[in-house]
C-alpha cells in the first residue's frame, strides 16, 4: 500500500512538472505569435496590450496562499489588516520555510523551477531593457528569503552578484549555487569572505561584487546592494524611472555624525574569534582631512561612482583607513558621497545632509523613532517584532511602506509574518504587469 502511494505521488509530480513545462512553452509561443514588448508597454492603451497583460498576469500572478485580502491590506483597510494578523498567528506554528534540500531538488530541472516559482523571464518594456541595474546580494542563511528576494527583483536584462558568507553551511552554499545556475545573469562573487558583524568584511563583500559587476558585459547604469532580509517595494519599471530621475547622482544616507558615533573611527578595532573588539589605540585623522559623515550600509550608486570607489587613489586611501573601524559600511559610503572627487557627490555643508527617509536606498523603521505621528514621530509603531532595534515588518506596515519613495525596505522574515511578504509579492507582481496598484 505504501509503495502504491509513493508511485502515485511520483506520477503526480511528473504530471505536474510536464504541465508546468507545457504551460511555459505555450506562454512563450503565445507571446511570439501575438505579443511583444510594445504590447506590454504600460503607455500603450490598445486592446491587444490589455489582452497580452491579462495572459501574462494569469500565468505569473503570485496570489497569497492564505485567505487574506491583500488588496485591502496594501490599501490600509483595518479589517483586512486585522484578518491578516490573526491569520498569521493561527498558522505561524505550521509555517516551515523551504529548506536547502527543497531547492536542491527543485532546481534539478531549471525550466520547471523557474515556471513553478514564477520568475519573470523576459523584459516587460523597452525602457527597462535600455536601463539595466546591477545588484550585490550579500547573504549567509535562510535560503527561502534569498530565493524570494531574487524572484522579486529579477529581470533578465539586469545583472546579479551573490556573495555567500564563507562560513555559511555547505548545504546552503550548494542550494544557492543550484538556484543561480538556472539564470545566465546571476553569479556567485569570484572572491568570498568570512563576514563578521560590524567589521570591514561586510564592505569587502560588496566591493568584491562591485569588481565582478564592472567586469561583466552588461552595461548597467546603477548599483544597488542588498541583504537577505531586504525586499523591494517598487517594481523594476518604477526603479528604472526613479534611477533615471537621479540623472547620474547617487542616493544614500549621509549626515553629520552625532558625537557618540565618533569612537567608531577614532579608535582601532580588531576582530577576535569572529567578534569585533574596541582597543585603546587611537587612529590618525582621516586622509585629506576629510570630514566624516554617517549613514547606513545600503546605497544607490551610479556606475561612475562605483568605478571611482575601486580605481580612484583618494578613495582607495580612505578605504584603507576605515578598515579597522567599527561598522565602516555606515561611514565609508556616507563620507565618499561628500567627497568632491566622487561622481554624483554633494557638498559638505549640512544643507546637503541626506537622512535615511530622504534617500531612496532603504526604508527602515527604527524602534527608537517609532511613536505617535501626531506628536512628531516619523512613523507609527512596528506591527511585527523588533530585531536589533529594527522593525521586522508585519502586514500592518505595508500601507505606510508603499506610500514611501524608497526602492527597498528592511527587514522581512517569513517566520515572523509571511502574510506581509505574500501580500507584497502579490502587489508587486500586479504592479509589474499592469502598472497600477492592486
Swiss-Prot record:
Q: Give the catalytic activity.
A: a 3-O-[beta-D-galactosyl-(1->3)-N-acetyl-alpha-D-galactosaminyl]-L-seryl-[protein] + UDP-N-acetyl-alpha-D-glucosamine = 3-O-{beta-D-galactosyl-(1->3)-[N-acetyl-beta-D-glucosaminyl-(1->6)]-N-acetyl-alpha-D-galactosaminyl}-L-seryl-[protein] + UDP + H(+); a 3-O-[beta-D-galactosyl-(1->3)-N-acetyl-alpha-D-galactosaminyl]-L-threonyl-[protein] + UDP-N-acetyl-alpha-D-glucosamine = a 3-O-{beta-D-galactosyl-(1->3)-[N-acetyl-beta-D-glucosaminyl-(1->6)]-N-acetyl-alpha-D-galactosaminyl}-L-threonyl-[protein] + UDP + H(+); a beta-D-Gal-(1->4)-beta-D-GlcNAc-(1->3)-beta-D-Gal-(1->4)-beta-D-GlcNAc derivative + UDP-N-acetyl-alpha-D-glucosamine = a beta-D-Gal-(1->4)-beta-D-GlcNAc-(1->3)-[beta-D-GlcNAc-(1->6)]-beta-D-Gal-(1->4)-N-acetyl-beta-D-glucosaminyl derivative + UDP + H(+); 3-O-[N-acetyl-beta-D-glucosaminyl-(1->3)-N-acetyl-alpha-D-galactosaminyl]-L-seryl-[protein] + UDP-N-acetyl-alpha-D-glucosamine = 3-O-[N-acetyl-beta-D-glucosaminyl-(1->3)-[N-acetyl-beta-D-glucosaminyl-(1->6)]-N-acetyl-alpha-D-galactosaminyl]-L-seryl-[protein] + UDP + H(+)
The keyword Transmembrane belongs to this UniProt entry's keyword annotation? yes
UniProt keyword annotations, A-Z:
Disulfide bond, Glycoprotein, Glycosyltransferase, Golgi apparatus, Membrane, Signal-anchor, Transferase, Transmembrane, Transmembrane helix
One of the GO BP terms on file: protein O-linked glycosylation
**Tissues expressing the protein:** Primarily expressed in mucus-secreting tissues. Expressed in colon, kidney, small intestine, trachea, and stomach, where mucin is produced.
Q: In which pathway does it act?
A: Protein modification; protein glycosylation
Q: What residues are glycosylation sites in this protein? A: 289
State the InterPro entries in the record: Glyco_trans_14 (IPR003406)
- Record flagged with keyword Coiled coil: no
Any idea where this protein resides? Golgi apparatus membrane
- Name the membrane topology term: Single-pass type II membrane protein
The family database entries (Pfam families) matched by this protein are listed as: Branch
Induction (UniProt): By all-trans retinoic acid (ATRA), TNF and IL13/interleukin-13. Strongly down-regulated in colorectal cancer.
Mark the transmembrane ranges. 7-26
PTM (free text): N-glycosylated.
What EC identifiers does the entry list?
2.4.1.102, 2.4.1.148, 2.4.1.150
Primary location class: Golgi
> Which PANTHER family does the entry mention?
BETA-1,3-GALACTOSYL-O-GLYCOSYL-GLYCOPROTEIN BETA-1,6-N-ACETYLGLUCOSAMINYLTRANSFERASE 3 (PTHR19297:SF81), GLYCOSYLTRANSFERASE 14 FAMILY MEMBER (PTHR19297)
The name under which this protein is listed is Beta-1,3-galactosyl-O-glycosyl-glycoprotein beta-1,6-N-acetylglucosaminyltransferase 3
In its UniProt entry, the species of origin is given as Homo sapiens
